[in-house]
Amino acid sequence: MIHFLLCFNRQSKVRLSKFYSTYTPTEKNRATREVMNQVLSRSPKFCNFVQWREFTIVYQRFASLFFVMVTDSTDNELVTLESIQRFVVVLDIVFGNICELDLIYEFQRAYQVLDEFLLTGHLQESSSKEILRAINDAEGMEKSLLVAEVLDQHFL
């Protein structure tokens, strides 16, 4: 099970975070800080897996961003690493070459992709095509609702 996902830059600025286990706000802040310190203190030559408490930290760096999943220590690290890779590929397609600014200014879309990808800490959909199809359907529905709202306002 994935307990939480973080995305942050080298300056320890969190750009995306989602917790799938119950934590108090204080525990979330502490866990986030500890995980960021663990990841940022490691050399790029080291393995992308770190034991932390009773969990395993699995991370991957893409440009200036670190994508981190904290999982049970019994989970397969390579599958988790592949999940991170898939998530970033889908973000790359949705945003057209993902960058940190996309996560800052269009964080709703990033969370939408994440919600299509993971559900309650488990991989919901592994197919990039299905994730993209669901996102396109949701955006199409959102646009049609917006058009209907505008029509209602102007023609009532």
From Swiss-Prot:
Gene3D superfamilies: 3.30.450.60. It is found in: Golgi apparatus, trans-Golgi network; Cytoplasmic vesicle, Clathrin-coated vesicle membrane. CDD domains: AP1_sigma. GO terms for biological process: protein transport; vesicle-mediated transport. Keywords: Cytoplasmic vesicle, Golgi apparatus, Membrane, Protein transport, Transport. The keyword Protein biosynthesis does not apply. InterPro entries: AP1_sigma, AP_complex_ssu, AP_mu_sigma_su, Longin-like_dom_sf. Its main location: Golgi. One of its GO terms (molecular function) is clathrin adaptor activity. One of its GO terms (cellular component) is intracellular membrane-bounded organelle. Subunit of clathrin-associated adaptor protein complex 1 that plays a role in protein sorting in the trans-Golgi network (TGN) and endosomes. The AP complexes mediate the recruitment of clathrin to membranes and the recognition of sorting signals within the cytosolic tails of transmembrane cargo molecules. Also involved in early steps of phagocytosis and macropinocytosis. Adaptor protein complex 1 (AP-1) is a heterotetramer composed of two large adaptins (gamma-type subunit and beta-type subunit), a medium adaptin (mu-type subunit) and a small adaptin (sigma-type subunit). Belongs to the adaptor complexes small subunit family. This is AP-1 complex subunit sigma-1. It comes from Dictyostelium discoideum (Social amoeba).
